[in-house]
């Protein structure tokens, strides 16, 4: 469909009285009205047009109410608050002809509302989305938190770059965890995404952009995150930990392997490792050693444990979780 046809189709559904485009189409028959949220705010005037060739005998209702709001092919409404949002339906002779769902996006003191998601405050305040990648394959996972349990939907879009975006495909959003935090329950949602034409060895010049649309009842909010894959790398823990006590010695030879999920070849995508021996009491001082090798000799006392974690050798991204094995 050409641009002109798109414009005609758009205005056959909703006409904007505001010159600032304070209403836009989220998806078919669903529109977001952007409102400055303060006492006595004027709101936005919206003119809805029934998608039908009929001209006469048309009436309008809101949601499940049978109350007739107006008649005629168009309906003019002043949207000021959530009571003005919802699904508007035009009817004729008891038959529904078309629908338009209006959602509200609040702006208070020039700042868009962030009521739906919880601020994770890591690595900094106002962090609503967090993302990690296990390797350089272009596959990554993002997650977010909310205390809302019902009437909640999410959709995710992603690309590399914004001016000339390159494809990133994201799967379905899933509820991945539930936790109790004091008197509140916290819900973690996540999504997995894959860059369509990833080149693991290439230098990244444009960041990945992730955009999450959140809808709670009739409230719309939008959250974004921008990053390079190299900045969100967090390897899986090293695997196959082996500990072999040395004869007539308190020392032990320990070894481990790269995680299966790490990029190959390992000669190019190299890891560095942090190893430590932890006594039975967590208050005991930990002896930590850093090495690029996959083996080491350590003093491993009775009732202690040996642990190792991994990090990209050439870029200071996140360390993996610890992998551990008892000393005896």
Curated annotation (Swiss-Prot):
Residues 237-328 form the Fibronectin type-III domain. GO terms for molecular function: cytokine activity; cytokine receptor activity. Glycans are attached at residues 125, 135, 222, 303. SMART domains: IGc2. It is found in: Secreted. Heterodimer with IL12A; disulfide-linked. The heterodimer is known as interleukin IL-12. Heterodimer with IL23A; disulfide-linked. The heterodimer is known as interleukin IL-23. Also secreted as a monomer. Interacts with NBR1; this interaction promotes IL-12 secretion. Belongs to the IL-12B family. This is Interleukin-12 subunit beta. It comes from Papio anubis. The lineage of its organism: Eukaryota, Metazoa, Chordata, Craniata, Vertebrata. The gene is IL12B.
């Amino acid at each position: 469909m050409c641009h002109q046809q798109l414009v005609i189709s758009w205005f056959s559904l909703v006409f904007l009285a505001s010159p600032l485009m304070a209403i836009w189409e989220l998806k078919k028959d669903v529109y977001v009205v952007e409102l400055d949220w303060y006492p006595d705010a004027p709101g936005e005037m919206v003119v809805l047009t029934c998608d039908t060739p009929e001209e006469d005998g048309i009436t309008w209702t809101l949601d499940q109410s049978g109350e007739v709001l107006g008649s005629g092919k168009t309906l003019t409404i002043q949207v000021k608050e959530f009571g003005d949002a919802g699904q508007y339906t035009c009817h004729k002779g008891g038959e529904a002809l078309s629908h338009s769902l209006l959602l509200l996006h609040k702006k208070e003191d020039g700042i868009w509302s962030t009521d739906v998601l919880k601020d994770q405050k890591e690595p900094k305040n106002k962090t609503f989305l967090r993302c990690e990648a296990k390797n350089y394959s272009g596959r990554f996972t993002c997650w977010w938190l909310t205390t809302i349990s019902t009437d909640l939907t999410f959709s995710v879009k992603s690309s590399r770059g914004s001016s000339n975006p390159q494809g990133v495909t994201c799967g379905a959003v899933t509820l991945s965890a539930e936790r109790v935090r004091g008197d509140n329950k916290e819900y973690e949602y996540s999504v997995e995404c894959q860059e369509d034409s990833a080149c693991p060895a290439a230098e990244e010049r444009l960041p990945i952009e992730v955009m999450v649309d959140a809808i709670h009842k009739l409230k719309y909010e939008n959250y974004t995150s921008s990053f390079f894959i190299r900045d969100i790398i967090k390897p899986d823990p090293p695997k196959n930990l082996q500990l072999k006590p040395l004869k007539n010695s308190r020392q032990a030879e320990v070894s481990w392997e790269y995680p299966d999920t790490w990029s190959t070849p390992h000669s190019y995508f190299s890891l560095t490792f942090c190893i430590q021996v932890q006594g039975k009491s967590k208050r005991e001082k930990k002896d930590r050693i850093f090495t690029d090798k996959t083996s080491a000799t350590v003093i491993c006392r009775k009732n202690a444990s040996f642990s190792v974690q991994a990090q990209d050798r050439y870029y200071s991204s996140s360390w993996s979780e610890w992998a551990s094995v008892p000393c005896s």
